[in-house]
C-alpha cells in the first residue's frame, strides 16, 4: 500500500512522537494566523484533507475542529525543550525581531548628529547582526518583519537592516522607547519607519525651507557688517532654528491654534524676533544704535525684550508672543507656562489646542538648571498643565567656554532630564534642514495628539564666541578650526537643491538678494505677518495703564449681600461629611455672618474672595497647602470624610460666576512662583495669589522676585498684579520658620514698583485683597501674613468693618488716650503690636501711644504725619520690631519715619527697639526667644 502523506511525515526525524506537542502548537498557530508559521509548514497544513475521503489517511476534520477549539480557548500545549524542536530559522527569526527593537531603542547612538563630526561615539554592539548570532550569510534570507512599518510582512535581513539604519542611524536620532504607553511608542515607530526618517518634500516646501535659512543667515551677516563687534548673541551655526519655529507656528495654526507663546534666552533671539515674529528690522537697528525707545523706566538690552504680533497660517490668524526674559537661564520657561495657562483659561481651552507654548533652551542650561526639572514636573499636574510644551534645545555643544561633556553633565545627552516625564526626544543634525523639518512636524503632531511635552534636540554649533566680542579659539581650538572650514547650513542646502535640480543657482541667489534689499529698506521681512492684526487675540491692558498710587477705589461692599455670600459659603452638599474640627470652624463662621461672633482672619479672607467673584473677578490661589492653609485657617476646600471627595464652596456661589481656582501646588517655589507671575501678567482682571507654606521658603524663588516681580515693569513695562502671601512672625519656632525676610523685599522697593503690606486685622486683609483688584493699578503685592494672629483673641473685626471700611496704610491708636499726655510714640508692624498692647495694658501706661504701619511701601508718610499730629507733647519716637536690627524694616524704612518725626517736631530722634543684629533670622531655643522678646518690648517703652 502506498504510504500516506502522514505516514511519510511520521517517518521523518522532526515529526517523531516526541515532537507531537510542538506540531500541535504550530498547527494551532496556523489556525489562528496562517502567516505566523514558516512557509513549509503553512504549505503542508494547507494540503491536509478537510474531510474523510478515499485517502488512507485518518480523517482530519475532527482533529482540525479540536485544534480550532484549542485556539479559541487559548490553551497551549507544552512543547519539549525549544532547543530540541525549534528550527534554526525560527531561532533567527526571534533574533531579527530583537534586532529591530534594538535599533528602535539604541539606533540614536549610531546616528550622525554632529554637523562638525567631533562626537566620538562607538556604535552599540547590539546594533550588529553578529550580536544576535546572525552572519552575512543570512543577509538575503527572508524574515517576517513583525511590527516593523516598512510596508512588507516579509523582507530579507538586508532589507530590514537597510530600513532600520536609514530610519534610526542617519541624521535623526529618536528616543521614544522609554515611554511607558505603547500607543505612543507605536505612533513614533510608525511615523518614522514608514518614511524611513526622510519623507519626500515638494519643490515648494524645499524652496520655503531655503528661504527661511536665507533669512536666518542674511540677518546675521547684515548685523555683523553694520554693527561689527556689537553683542547680539547670534544664531550663526544654528540657523535651522528659524525654520523650526516657523514650522511649529504654521503647523499649529493648521490645527486651529490661535496663540503661540515663546520663551527663550539670548542666543538667536534677535533673529527670531525679526524672522519668525515679524519685528521691523528698523526698530532693531534703532536698538543697536542705542536710541532710547522706552518712555519710562530703565529699559533693558535688546536681546531681553519681548514682542508680540499676528501671523497668517493655513488655519487662520495666530497671535505670537515672545516673553520678556532676564539673563538668568531657563527661568522664563515656567513664566511662559503660566502665561499660556492664563490664555487657555480665558479661551476655555480645555484641550490646550488653541494656545501652544514653545520653550527654547541652550544645551548647557537645559542640563544644568534645576528649574528645568521643576517645569517638566508641572507638565501633567492639573493646576499647571498646558497640553504639552514643544521644547527646542539649541545644542551648539558649548556653554560659554565649557564644551567637554564631562564638565557639563553626568548624562549621555543634555536632553536626558526630559525623560523624567517620559517626553520623547528627537535629536537632529542641524545641517540637514529636511530632517529638521520632519522632526518638527513630528513634534507638533505628537503634542497635538497626546497633549504631552516633546523635545527637539537641534544639534548645531556656535560659529562665533559666546558673544561677538569674544574669541573662542583660546578654549576650544579644535572645534573652531573645524568651524572655520564648515560651510553654512544655507550653503550646504542650496548646493544640494541645485544639484538635485529643485532650484537653479539664480533662484538661490535671488532669495539672498531679496532679503538683503528688504533689510536695506527697513521693511518687514516676514511674509506671513498680518499688518492689521485682529485685536481680539490680544490681552487688553488698556484699563490698567497710566494710573497712580492715589487712584480712587472703593472696597466697601453691601452688608446684606456680604451676609448672603457668607451663608452660601456654608452650604454643603447633602451627605457630605466634614471633619469634626472643620465643622466647628464652619459653625463659627455662620455665627460670624450674623454678627454673633467677631470676624476672624479665615472668615474675612474667604469673604474677600467671595465678594470679588460676585463682582466679576476671577480668583486663582496656588501654593503648598493653600486649600486648608498651612496653619489650618482657610479651609476653602472641604474633604468628605466618607469618600475623600472634595467640595469648594467658592466655586459654587452662583450660576455663571467667574472661575475660582484653588490648587495645592507640588513642592516647588521657583517654578510655581514664576508660573503665577506669568499667569498674572496675562490676566489683569483677576486676583492671582501665590502663598508660601512659610514665608521663610519664598527665597527658594529669589530669582523670580529679583528679575521679574520687582523689576519687570521698569525693565520691560510689564505690568503685574500678582499677590504673594508670606506667613511671617516670631513665635519661637527657630530660624527656619520665623521670617519671610521682609528686609529683602523692602530693599527692592524703588520707583513705586511693588507694594509691601503687613496687615494685622481681618478687615485689613479683606480690604487689602479687594483693593488689589478693584483699584485699576497693577503692581505686585507682597503681604506678610500672620500665624498666631489667625486665632488671636484681639485680632478680630466686625461685619461693619468689612462692609463699610477700607484699607488703612496706617492704623492709629485704638485706646482712648489723652493725646496731650502721650510722650512716647511706638511705631511697629505686624504681630509685635499685640504684644506691645498687652504690655501697656498690664502696666497701665497712658503716656505711650502705639501706631501700626500696615503698608511699608510705598511708605505712607502723609498718613503717618496725620496720625501723629494730635500728639503735641511727644518726647520719644521708637520703631519696634521683632526681627534683628540688620533685618526687618529698620534699615530700609527708618529714613521715612525720621522724615515724618522731624517734620512733626524737629528735636525728635527715631530710636530702635528690637533684637540685636544676627546672622540668622531667629534663635532656636524657646527660652532665649522669650528673653529676647521681653527685652525688645521693654526697650520699646524705655529706650
UniProtKB/Swiss-Prot annotation:
Pfam families: 2-oxogl_dehyd_N, E1_dh, OxoGdeHyase_C, Transket_pyr. Keywords: Glycolysis, Oxidoreductase, Thiamine pyrophosphate. It comes from the Bacteria. Disulfide bonds: none annotated. One of its GO terms (molecular function) is oxoglutarate dehydrogenase (succinyl-transferring) activity. Its cofactor is thiamine diphosphate. It catalyses: N(6)-[(R)-lipoyl]-L-lysyl-[protein] + 2-oxoglutarate + H(+) = N(6)-[(R)-S(8)-succinyldihydrolipoyl]-L-lysyl-[protein] + CO2. One of its GO terms (cellular component) is cytosol. Gene3D superfamilies: 3.40.50.12470, 3.40.50.970, Multifunctional 2-oxoglutarate metabolism enzyme, C-terminal domain (3.40.50.11610), TPP helical domain (1.10.287.1150). Its EC number is 1.2.4.2. InterPro entries: 2-oxogl_dehyd_N, 2oxoglutarate_DH_E1, DH_E1, KGD_C_sf, ODO-1/KGD_C, THDP-binding, Transketolase-like_Pyr-bd. GO terms for biological process: glycolytic process; tricarboxylic acid cycle. SMART domains: Transket_pyr. CDD domains: TPP_E1_OGDC_like. Homodimer. Part of the 2-oxoglutarate dehydrogenase (OGDH) complex composed of E1 (2-oxoglutarate dehydrogenase), E2 (dihydrolipoamide succinyltransferase) and E3 (dihydrolipoamide dehydrogenase); the complex contains multiple copies of the three enzymatic components (E1, E2 and E3). E1 component of the 2-oxoglutarate dehydrogenase (OGDH) complex which catalyzes the decarboxylation of 2-oxoglutarate, the first step in the conversion of 2-oxoglutarate to succinyl-CoA and CO(2). Belongs to the alpha-ketoglutarate dehydrogenase family. This is 2-oxoglutarate dehydrogenase E1 component. It comes from Azotobacter vinelandii. The gene is sucA.
Amino acid at each position: 500500500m502506498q504510504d500516506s502523506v502522514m505516514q511519510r511525515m511520521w517517518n521523518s526525524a522532526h515529526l517523531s512522537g516526541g515532537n507531537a506537542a510542538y506540531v500541535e502548537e504550530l498547527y494551532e498557530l496556523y489556525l489562528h494566523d496562517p502567516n505566523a508559521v514558516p512557509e513549509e509548514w503553512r504549505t503542508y497544513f494547507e494540503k491536509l484533507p478537510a474531510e474523510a475521503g478515499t485517502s488512507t489517511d485518518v480523517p482530519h476534520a475532527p482533529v482540525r475542529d479540536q485544534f480550532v477549539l484549542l485556539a479559541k480557548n487559548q490553551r497551549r500545549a507544552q512543547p519539549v525543550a525549544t532547543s530540541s524542536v525549534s528550527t534554526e530559522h525560527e531561532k533567527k527569526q526571534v533574533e531579527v525581531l530583537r534586532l529591530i527593537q534594538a535599533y528602535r531603542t539604541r539606533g540614536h547612538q549610531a546616528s550622525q548628529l554632529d554637523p562638525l563630526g567631533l562626537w566620538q561615539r562607538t556604535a552599540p554592539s547590539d546594533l550588529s547582526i553578529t550580536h544576535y548570532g546572525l552572519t552575512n550569510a543570512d543577509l538575503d534570507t527572508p524574515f517576517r518583519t513583525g511590527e516593523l512599518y516598512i510596508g512588507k510582512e516579509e523582507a530579507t535581513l538586508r532589507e530590514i537592516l537597510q530600513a532600520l539604519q536609514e530610519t534610526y542611524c542617519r541624521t535623526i536620532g529618536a528616543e521614544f522607547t522609554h515611554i511607558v504607553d505603547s500607543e505612543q511608542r507605536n505612533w513614533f515607530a510608525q511615523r518614522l519607519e514608514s518614511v524611513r526618517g526622510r519623507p519626500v518634500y515638494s519643490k515648494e516646501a524645499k524652496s520655503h525651507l531655503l528661504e527661511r535659512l536665507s533669512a536666518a543667515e542674511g540677518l546675521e551677516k547684515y548685523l555683523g557688517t553694520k554693527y561689527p563687534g556689537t553683542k547680539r548673541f547670534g544664531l550663526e551655526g544654528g540657523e535651522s532654528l528659524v525654520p523650526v519655529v516657523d514650522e511649529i507656528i504654521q503647523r499649529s495654526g493648521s490645527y486651529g491654534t490661535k496663540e503661540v507663546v515663546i520663551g527663550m534666552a539670548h542666543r538667536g533671539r534677535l533673529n527670531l524676533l525679526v524672522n519668525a515674529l515679524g519685528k521691523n528690522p528698523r526698530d532693531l537697528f534703532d536698538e543697536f544704535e542705542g536710541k532710547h525707545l522706552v518712555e519710562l523706566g530703565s529699559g533693558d538690552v535688546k536681546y531681553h525684550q519681548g514682542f508680540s504680533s499676528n501671523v497668517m497660517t493655513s488655519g487662520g490668524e495666530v497671535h505670537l508672543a515672545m516673553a520678556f526674559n532676564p539673563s538668568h537661564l531657563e527661568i522664563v520657561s515656567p513664566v511662559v507656562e503660566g502665561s499660556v495657562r492664563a490664555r487657555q483659561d480665558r479661551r476655555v481651552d480645555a484641550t490646550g489646542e488653541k494656545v501652544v507654548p514653545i520653550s527654547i533652551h541652550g544645551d548647557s542650561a537645559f542640563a544644568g538648571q534645576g528649574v528645568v526639572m521643576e517645569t517638566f514636573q508641572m507638565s501633567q499636574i492639573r493646576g499647571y498643565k498646558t497640553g504639552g510644551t514643544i521644547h527646542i534645545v539649541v545644542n551648539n555643544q558649548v556653554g560659554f567656554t565649557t564644551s567637554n561633556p564631562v564638565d557639563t553633565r553626568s548624562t549621555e545627552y543634555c536632553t536626558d532630564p526630559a525623560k523624567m516625564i517620559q517626553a520623547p526626544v528627537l535629536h537632529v543634525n542641524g545641517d540637514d534642514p529636511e530632517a529638521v523639518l520632519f522632526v518638527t512636524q513630528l513634534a507638533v503632531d505628537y503634542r497635538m495628539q497626546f497633549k504631552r511635552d516633546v523635545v527637539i534636540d537641534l544639534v548645531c554649533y556656535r560659529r562665533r564666541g559666546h558673544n561677538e566680542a569674544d574669541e573662542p579659539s583660546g578654549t576650544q581650538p579644535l572645534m573652531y578650526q573645524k568651524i572655520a572650514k564648515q560651510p553654512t547650513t544655507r550653503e550646504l542646502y542650496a548646493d544640494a537643491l541645485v544639484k538635485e535640480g529643485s532650484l537653479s543657482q539664480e533662484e538661490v541667489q535671488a532669495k539672498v538678494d531679496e532679503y538683503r534689499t528688504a533689510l536695506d529698506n527697513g521693511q518687514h521681512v516676514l511674509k506671513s505677518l498680518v499688518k492689521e492684526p485682529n485685536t481680539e487675540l490680544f490681552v487688553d491692558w488698556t484699563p490698567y495703564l497710566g494710573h497712580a498710587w492715589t487712584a480712587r477705589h472703593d472696597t466697601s461692599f453691601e452688608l446684606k449681600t456680604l451676609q448672603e455670600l457668607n451663608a452660601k459659603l456654608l452650604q454643603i452638599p447633602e451627605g457630605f461629611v466634614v471633619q469634626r474640627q472643620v465643622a466647628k470652624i464652619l459653625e463659627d463662621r455662620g455665627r460670624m455672618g450674623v454678627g454673633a461672633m467677631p470676624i476672624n482672619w479665615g472668615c474675612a479672607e474667604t469673604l474677600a474672595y467671595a465678594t470679588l467673584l460676585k463682582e466679576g473677578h476671577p480668583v486663582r490661589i496656588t501654593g503648598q497647602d493653600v486649600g486648608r492653609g498651612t496653619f489650618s485657617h482657610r479651609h476653602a476646600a472641604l474633604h468628605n470624610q466618607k469618600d475623600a471627595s472634595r467640595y469648594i464652596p467658592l466655586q459654587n456661589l452662583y450660576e455663571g460666576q467667574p472661575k475660582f481656582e484653588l490648587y495645592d501646588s507640588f513642592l516647588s517655589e521657583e517654578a510655581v512662583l514664576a508660573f503665577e507671575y506669568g499667569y498674572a501678567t496675562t490676566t489683569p482682571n483677576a486676583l492671582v495669589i501665590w502663598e508660601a507654606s512659610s514665608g521663610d521658603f519664598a527665597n527658594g524663588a529669589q530669582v523670580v522676585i529679583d528679575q521679574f516681580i520687582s523689576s519687570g515693569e521698569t525693565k520691560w513695562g510689564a505690568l503685574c498684579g500678582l499677590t504673594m502671601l508670606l506667613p511671617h512672625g516670631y513665635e519661637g519656632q527657630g530660624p527656619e520658620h520665623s521670617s519671610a525676610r521682609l528686609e529683602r523685599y523692602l530693599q527692592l522697593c524703588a520707583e513705586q514698583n511693588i507694594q509691601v503690606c503687613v496687615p494685622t486685622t481681618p478687615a485689613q486683609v479683606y480690604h487689602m485683597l479687594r483693593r488689589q483688584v478693584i483699584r485699576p493699578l497693577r503692581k505686585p503685592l507682597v503681604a506678610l501674613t500672620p500665624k498666631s494672629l489667625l486665632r488671636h483673641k484681639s485680632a478680630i473685626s466686625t461685619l461693619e468693618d468689612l462692609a463699610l471700611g477700607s484699607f488703612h496704610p496706617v492704623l492709629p491708636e485704638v485706646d482712648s488716650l489723652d493725646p496731650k499726655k502721650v510722650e512716647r510714640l511706638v511705631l511697629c508692624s505686624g504681630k509685635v503690636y499685640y504684644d506691645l498692647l498687652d504690655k501697656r495694658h498690664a502696666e497701665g501706661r497712658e503716656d505711650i501711644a502705639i501706631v501700626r504701619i500696615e503698608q511699608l511701601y510705598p511708605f505712607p508718610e502723609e498718613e503717618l504725619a496725620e496720625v501723629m499730629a494730635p500728639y503735641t507733647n511727644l518726647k520719644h519716637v521708637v520703631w519696634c520690631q521683632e526681627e534683628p536690627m540688620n533685618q526687618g524694616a529698620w534699615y530700609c524704612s527708618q529714613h521715612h519715619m525720621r522724615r515724618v518725626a522731624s517734620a512733626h517736631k524737629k528735636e525728635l530722634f527715631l530710636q530702635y527697639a528690637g533684637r540685636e543684629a544676627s546672622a540668622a533670622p531667629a534663635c532656636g531655643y524657646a527660652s532665649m526667644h522669650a528673653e529676647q522678646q521681653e527685652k525688645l518690648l521693654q526697650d520699646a517703652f524705655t529706650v
